[in-house]
Amino acid sequence: MKYIINNFNLFDLQAKLKNFLSKNYKNKYYKRIKQKIFSYINLCNDYYNGNFLLKDLIKKYFKNKFSTFYYWANKILIAYKSNDFAELLLKSTIPNNINYQYSNDVRQNICDLYFKYCNKHAGGVLSLFYNLKKGIHGEELKNKAPKNLKTFFRWLKKDERWLKIKNKIKEIKKQHSRYEVKEIGLLQMDAKYFVPSKFSVDKKYYVYDFIDEKTRLALGYVYDKLSTDNAIDAVKKAISDFKNIFGIIITRIRTDNGSEFINNYRNNQKISVKKTNFTQFLTDKNILHQTTPVRSPQSNGKIERFHQNYTKLFVFEEKILNAVSLQNKLNDYYYFYNFERVHKSLNFQTPFNFLNSLSLIK
C-alpha cells in the first residue's frame, strides 16, 4: 500500500516518532500532532494484525476524513525516508501581512486613487481592487495594495471622503419624491404563499392579491395551486369586487413574470414572449396587462410591501384546515386593512376614506 509503511519498518518508525514527540512536547500544537501520529500508527498496526479494509480503518481513526489521512500519511512517510521529522511540526496560519502592517502612506495613496477613480470612471470598489491586482495602476501599488478585499474596503470606509459621499446619498434619498399614480384603477397583482412553517395552516396555500396603486385598497383570493386558470378566476373576482365594493373600474393590472401570467420561450438566440390566455382575457376585458422587468420586484413595490405586512398584522391562533376558512380570515383582515388601518402614505387616512376624499374633490 502506498500510504501504509512496510511492516518491517513499522516498529522503527514508531520508535523514532516517540523520540520526536518527547523532544517537542512544549510545541504549541503538540496535542494535535500527537493525535495524528498515534492515529496513523494504530491504523498501521490494525491493518497488519487484522483483516480490516483501509477505508474502515480511516473511518475509525480519522473520522472518515480520507484527505486528512492521506495528508498525514504522506508527511510521515516522507519524514521517515529523509530522517527529518521537523516537517511534522505545524506552523501558524496567521498571515504575515495583516492590515495594520501596511504603511499609512500606502493607505492614503490608495484612498486618494479611489476617490479620483470613482469620479472619472464612475467605478466602484471592486473594479479598482481588481485593477490594482492586475497592475493597471503601476507595479508599486500592485505590490503594496492589500490582498484582501475586506481590508481594502475597510480603508475606504474610514476615510472622511467616504462619509461625505454617504451623507450626500442620504440627502438625495430624502429629497426623492414618492412614486404615485394619478388615476384610480391601476392595480398591482402578485401571489403570496401561506406555508405551515410561518402561518397556522394545514398545508400550503396560495393567495392572489390585488392592490390599487392610488388608494392602497387591497383584496385577495385563496387557491390550492398557482395556474393560469386560477389567476384568471382571481381577476374575475377582483373586477367584480372592486366595482361593487369600492366603485373602482380596473383599467390596468401589473404582474411579475410568473409562468401563470406569461410564457417565455428561450433559446440560444433570442427570448420571445407569447401572449397567454391570461393576457388575452385581460385584453378582452379592456384591461392593459403590464409585466415588471425581470428580477425587479421593486417595480411592483406596493403589492410586495403589502405582502410583508402579513407577517406583522395577519395573526390568528386556531389552525386553519381548508381554503374556505383561510379566505374568511383574510376577508376580516382586508376589512381591517381597507376600512380601519390608517396609512402614512395617505396622510394618515384609511384607504377607503382616502377614496372618498378623492371623490369629494372631483
Curated annotation (Swiss-Prot):
Coiled coil: none annotated. The keyword Hydrolase applies. Residues 179-359 form the Integrase catalytic domain. InterPro entries: Integrase_cat-core (IPR001584), Retrotran_Ty1/copia-like (IPR039537), RNaseH-like_sf (IPR012337), RNaseH_sf (IPR036397). Mg(2+) binds at residues 190, 256. It comes from the Viruses. Keywords: DNA integration, DNA recombination, Endonuclease, Hydrolase, Magnesium, Metal-binding, Nuclease. One of its GO terms (molecular function) is nucleic acid binding. GO terms for biological process: DNA integration; DNA recombination. It holds the Pfam family rve. Belongs to the plectrovirus integrase ORF3 family. This protein may encode an integrase, which is necessary for integration of the viral DNA into host genome. This is Putative integrase ORF3. The lineage of its organism: Viruses, Monodnaviria, Loebvirae, Hofneiviricota, Faserviricetes.
